[in-house]
Swiss-Prot record:
Cofactor list: NH4(+); K(+)
Phylogenetic classification of the source organism: Bacteria, Bacillati, Actinomycetota, Actinomycetes, Micromonosporales
Pathway(s) it belongs to: Cofactor biosynthesis; coenzyme A biosynthesis; CoA from (R)-pantothenate: step 1/5
Binding site for K(+): 127
CDD domains: ASKHA_NBD_PanK-III
Subunit (UniProt): Homodimer.
Protein name in UniProt: Type III pantothenate kinase
Keywords noted in UniProt: ATP-binding, Coenzyme A biosynthesis, Cytoplasm, Kinase, Metal-binding, Nucleotide-binding, Potassium, Transferase
Amino acid sequence: MLLCIDIGNTNTVLATFDGDELVHSWRIKTDALSTADELGLMFRGLLAGDAVEVTGVAACSTVPTALRSVRTMLDRYYPDLPHMIVEPGVRTGVQLAIDNPKEVGADRVVNTLATYTLYGGPSIVVDFGTTTNFDVISGRGEFLGGAFAPGIEISFDALAARAAQLRKVEATRPRSVIGKNTVECLQAGLYFGFAGQVDRIVERMVEELGDVRAVIATGGLAPLVIKECRTITHHEPMITLIGLRMVYDRNV
């Protein structure tokens, strides 16, 4: 089976594929200081628990220090297996129609490939993670750029940190947009404000594009808020891993 690894700022998601079929998946906390040996032993433990036999590995990361450890881990623990890390020089088939292609994160590239392959374009991917990333894909499958916004958990943390009379509260949907106490008022403003922000950014993007085939939600925090977002058309929690599989097939 192919092992795909997506290392984000907060979480690392792994999945195994048998051909096009996703068979197993795991989500663990990202530690940018993890050594190659720690990663190797952890991944081997996860795979052994489900009796998974790996025949190849594909990886991408937005965390440079973690990516170096992954590269060393692959060479040390899987030296005989074909493996691929999404980085400049890897064939993705995605044209980057932006000012500086070197600035584009690997996750955004593989999201573009998977979304265009599955849904066509124009399309928009909203990745709900530590940050909220909006990725715009043309009708020809080009990556056109997008937008960044704070993630919902960052927004909750920032308000508590900067407002003396307010404390940190759980990032969750309140019972009403009209809060009856301090906690509910915080949750109402942040939660519904965040959902409204997502919808407005997507609406403005659609206005510029003219029309879209799909608006895809992904990322670990997507389930928290997508029911309140009126512009989301599909939820694909594994879109990055699916894209990794597609890039691997193009290169190995």
